């Protein structure tokens, strides 16, 4: 086929002769017509490589003599082992099990009544309540009014809880709803490519009313996944189906994700979510304990908050483990539960938390590594921008992540509290003004600190 040969020669110039010989010329042409080319890959790895590196190029540049695009259909050849199994199955008049996608399960306790709303998160909470039809507002926001809805915030800010709460509410109304983590979506793409079942994949993701995707920042560097999600997004959006996304960072701060996807993420409404403060954490614990039919003593709630500081997820995990282990361990009385007994029951989780807990020293070290300077430079007296900006950022993170008093931060950095307040205010102002450099560095450092 002349058009295919011309395309391969163009790829030899772009990718190199050896790469094309290894990955493209070994594809077997099954059949072709004016607008379709059917290829067979020798194995799933070759098919996946094609999807990652060539599919997008072929859609743009693979055309026939009439300047019309030629669609490539790719399947995977049967290996001898697979062929043997197929032969045996046919002999026994058996049939191959249908290709199926397994979606993420919804946490039954992630419901709107158990979400602790704060002043900062009120808009996001209210919007999703309206979409779910659970708001007392007379003129409520309907599905599709904002499309997509993009929620972002650090770990433990409530993104997953809100998404799952909405999924529960909409499913109860009889709507076809998919909640999926970005990692699961990626697994589905890879599995479907390997099985030659992309049509099943597309039908599963497009024959729905609402799509909720958690952790979309995970799409970073995944070319085939981004390509498939781009087309899934377009199809659903054109049909007026609601799309709701969640991520650890705003669309502008997403790393290594195609600009065309980033721009689509901003088409609707982008809403930030803030983690709970220590006082609000107690309300969260009490509400969660109530959902578990467990009366949590306040002294134990305060101990859990003091112990599991990394994020709300770690805190809830600690509570759930405590409730389960209390029910399994007859030695401890729920009514007379002590801090000592709680510590004994959760010792493994406490040790795990201590390994990952953020400390002022870890913050200073992470900032120094990010800027390529020494920790002594951050703690020293130098006023050059190379040292002053990292120092201000470290102070801001100590205040934001650890809720350290200004006086205590001043003692750590050998500065008076007014200097610390000025430094923290300077970074906060940059973040409020959407300084992409500062916000991007903050995001990278927090990712390192949170493992």
Swiss-Prot record:
It is found in: Cytoplasm. It comes from the Bacteria. ATP binds at residues 156, 158-160. SMART domains: AAA (SM00382), Bac_DnaA_C (SM00760). One of its GO terms (cellular component) is cytoplasm. Residues 1-68 are annotated as: Domain I, interacts with DnaA modulators. Residues 105-326 are annotated as: Domain III, AAA+ region. GO terms for molecular function: ATP binding; ATP hydrolysis activity; DNA replication origin binding; lipid binding. Keywords: ATP-binding, Cytoplasm, DNA replication, DNA-binding, Lipid-binding, Nucleotide-binding. Residues 327-451 are annotated as: Domain IV, binds dsDNA. The keyword Kinase does not apply. Residues 68-104 are annotated as: Domain II. GO terms for biological process: DNA replication initiation; regulation of DNA replication. Oligomerizes as a right-handed, spiral filament on DNA at oriC. Plays an essential role in the initiation and regulation of chromosomal replication. ATP-DnaA binds to the origin of replication (oriC) to initiate formation of the DNA replication initiation complex once per cell cycle. Binds the DnaA box (a 9 base pair repeat at the origin) and separates the double-stranded (ds)DNA. Forms a right-handed helical filament on oriC DNA; dsDNA binds to the exterior of the filament while single-stranded (ss)DNA is stabiized in the filament's interior. PANTHER family: CHROMOSOMAL REPLICATION INITIATOR PROTEIN DNAA (PTHR30050:SF2). Belongs to the DnaA family. Domain I is involved in oligomerization and binding regulators, domain II is flexibile and of varying length in different bacteria, domain III forms the AAA+ region, while domain IV binds dsDNA. This is Chromosomal replication initiator protein DnaA 2. The gene is dnaA2.
């Amino acid at each position: 086929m002349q058009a295919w040969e011309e395309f391969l020669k163009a790829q030899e110039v772009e990718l190199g002769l050896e790469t094309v010989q290894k990955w493209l010329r070994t594809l077997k042409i099954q059949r072709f017509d004016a607008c379709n080319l059917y290829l067979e890959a020798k194995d799933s790895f070759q098919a996946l490589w094609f999807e990652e590196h060539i599919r997008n190029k072929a859609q743009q540049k693979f055309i026939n003599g009439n300047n019309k695009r030629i669609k490539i259909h790719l399947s995977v050849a049967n290996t001898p082992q697979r062929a043997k199994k197929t032969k045996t199955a046919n002999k026994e008049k058996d049939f191959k099990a249908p290709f199926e996608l397994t979606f993420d399960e919804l946490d039954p306790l992630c419901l709107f009544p158990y979400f602790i709303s704060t002043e900062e998160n009120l808009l996001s909470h209210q919007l999703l309540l309206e979409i779910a039809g659970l708001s007392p507002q007379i003129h409520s926001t309907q599905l599709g009014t904002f499309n997509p809805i993009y929620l972002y915030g650090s770990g433990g800010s409530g993104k997953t809880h809100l998404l799952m709460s909405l999924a529960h509410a909409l499913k109860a109304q009889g709507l076809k709803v998919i909640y999926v983590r970005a990692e699961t979506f990626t697994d589905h793409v890879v599995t479907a490519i390997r099985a030659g079942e992309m049509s099943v994949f597309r039908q599963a993701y497009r024959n729905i009313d609402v799509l909720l995707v958690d952790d979309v920042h995970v799409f970073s560097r995944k070319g085939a996944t981004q390509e498939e999600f781009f087309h899934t997004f377009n199809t659903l959006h054109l049909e007026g189906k609601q799309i709701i996304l969640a991520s650890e960072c705003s669309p502008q701060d997403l790393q290594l994700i195609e600009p065309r996807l980033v721009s689509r993420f901003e088409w609707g409404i982008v809403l930030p979510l803030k983690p709970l403060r220590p006082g609000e954490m107690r309300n969260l614990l009490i509400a969660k304990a109530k959902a578990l039919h467990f009366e949590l003593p306040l002294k134990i709630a305060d101990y859990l908050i003091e112990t599991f500081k990394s994020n709300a997820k770690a805190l809830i995990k600690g509570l759930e483990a405590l409730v389960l282990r209390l029910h399994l361990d007859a030695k401890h009385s729920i009514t007379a539960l002590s801090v000592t007994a709680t510590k004994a029951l959760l010792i493994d989780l406490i040790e795990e938390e201590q390994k990952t807990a953020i400390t002022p020293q870890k913050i200073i070290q992470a900032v120094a590594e990010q800027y390529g300077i020494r920790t002594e430079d951050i703690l020293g007296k130098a006023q050059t921008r190379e040292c002053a900006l990292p120092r201000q950022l470290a102070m801001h993170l100590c205040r934001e992540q650890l809720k350290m008093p200004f006086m205590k931060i001043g003692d750590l950095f050998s500065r008076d509290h007014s200097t610390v307040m000025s430094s923290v205010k300077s970074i906060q102002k940059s973040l409020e003004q959407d300084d992409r450099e500062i916000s991007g560095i903050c995001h990278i450092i927090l990712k390192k600190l949170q493992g």
